């Protein structure tokens, strides 16, 4: 029952496992003195033409050690997990890529694998009371439920009082779901914790990522729980940040995408062009369609309706417009007929090139956030850290 009380208010919270080594390249077969007369073995594919593993790893470690902030705990462990993620994702260990990851980790967790959330216990209790009143649950019934011993030996009340991290909250929720009466019936398949780990990556993204690309570690637990480990949080966070073809002139826009969703900076610029052509004021949030729980929802968005007003000038009908808008979360959108014709009209109207990138205008909302923050604030703050990191790197000749 307690799981119900926590479910609504803790979603969208924004802020270590042991590394199991994985070779970044295939080792050559051993030399045989008298090989049998067999056909030559088929060469195994290599992910990219990188230097030999030992030199590549040594150079990457040297560079990363120089770029990491001075005073972080378990420097060797962070180095191992960051380089392992790059290798698994086949992303080169360049200063730009390393510093992008470093900047996000520093912003989201200050290099703490399971970062504390200020006031998490207070937030939990406030939501428990709100839900108790909403569902008319007698206070005595709730108090009795919270006195029940949980699997770790403490009562649920004691665990809520001691909450400090999202990983603890996630484990508490799992225990309540399986142990408290009615938990599975009421809340099976739902968990209020939606982000986690040192890069505060979306659990939904991690679950999708593992469907697209094999996870590089031996996994003994759920994808959700892997996000809360250092190795998993770094891997999924770096995938979210770097493992897609962002059409941007600066890393700044990837930082905005990390916060708002992939291609949000590209799409916000597209919305601005639509707004200027149609004369309609639009929220430049990077979402061209309406979404619910991460999937397109019924009903037209404001952006969609504004584009429909331009359909004669675009020489596209509503079905064709919707077809192309459904590509908005992929690189294919910028090659669509809608995208090309819309920008051609916008540039003909203004007499000047229109930007293809823009920081989304989104207010950040979470029980953890106690002041007004935006996606633009996040992106610029991370970009400052990114540039500071680059300044610690080697000077080009």
Residue ranges and their predicted role:
Residues 1-11:
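Sec-dependent bacterial lipoprotein signal peptides
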């Amino acid at each position: 029952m307690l799981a119900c009380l926590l479910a609504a208010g803790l979603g969208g919270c924004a802020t270590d496992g042991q590394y199991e080594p994985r070779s970044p390249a295939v080792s050559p077969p051993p030399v045989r003195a008298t090989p049998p007369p067999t056909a030559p073995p088929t060469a195994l594919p290599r992910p990219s033409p990188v230097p030999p593993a030992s030199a590549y790893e040594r150079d990457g470690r040297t560079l990363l050690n120089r770029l990491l902030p001075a005073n972080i705990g378990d420097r060797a462990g962070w180095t191992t997990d960051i380089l392992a993620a790059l290798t698994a994702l086949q992303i080169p260990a360049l200063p730009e890529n390393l510093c992008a990851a470093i900047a996000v980790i520093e912003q989201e967790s200050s290099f703490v694998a399971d970062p504390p959330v200020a006031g998490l216990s207070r937030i939990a209790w406030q939501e428990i009371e709100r839900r108790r009143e909403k569902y008319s649950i007698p206070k005595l019934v709730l108090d009795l439920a919270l006195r029940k011993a949980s699997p770790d030996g403490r009562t649920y009340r004691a665990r809520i009082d001691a909450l400090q991290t999202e990983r603890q909250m996630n484990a508490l929720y799992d225990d309540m779901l399986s142990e408290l009466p009615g938990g599975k019936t009421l809340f099976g398949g739902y968990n209020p914790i939606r982000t986690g780990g040192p890069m505060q990556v979306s659990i939904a993204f991690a679950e999708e990522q593992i469907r697209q690309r094999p996870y590089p570690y031996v996994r003994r637990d759920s994808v959700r729980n892997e996000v809360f480990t250092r190795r998993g949080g770094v891997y999924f966070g770096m995938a979210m940040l770097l493992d897609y073809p962002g059409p941007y002139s600066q890393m700044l826009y990837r930082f905005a995408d990390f916060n708002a969703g992939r291609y949000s900076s590209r799409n916000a610029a597209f919305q601005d062009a639509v707004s200027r052509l149609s004369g309609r004021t639009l929220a430049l949030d990077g979402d061209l369609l309406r979404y619910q729980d991460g999937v397109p929802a019924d009903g037209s968005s404001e952006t969609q309706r504004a584009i429909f007003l331009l359909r004669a000038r675009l020489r596209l009908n509503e079905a064709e417009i919707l077809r192309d808008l459904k590509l908005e979360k992929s690189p294919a959108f910028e090659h669509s007929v809608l995208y090309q014709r819309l920008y051609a009209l916008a540039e003909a109207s203004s007499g000047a090139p229109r930007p293809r990138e823009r920081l989304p205008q989104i207010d950040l909302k979470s029980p953890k956030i106690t002041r007004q923050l935006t996606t633009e604030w996040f992106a610029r703050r991370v970009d400052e850290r990114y540039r500071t990191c680059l300044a610690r790197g080697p000077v080009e000749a």
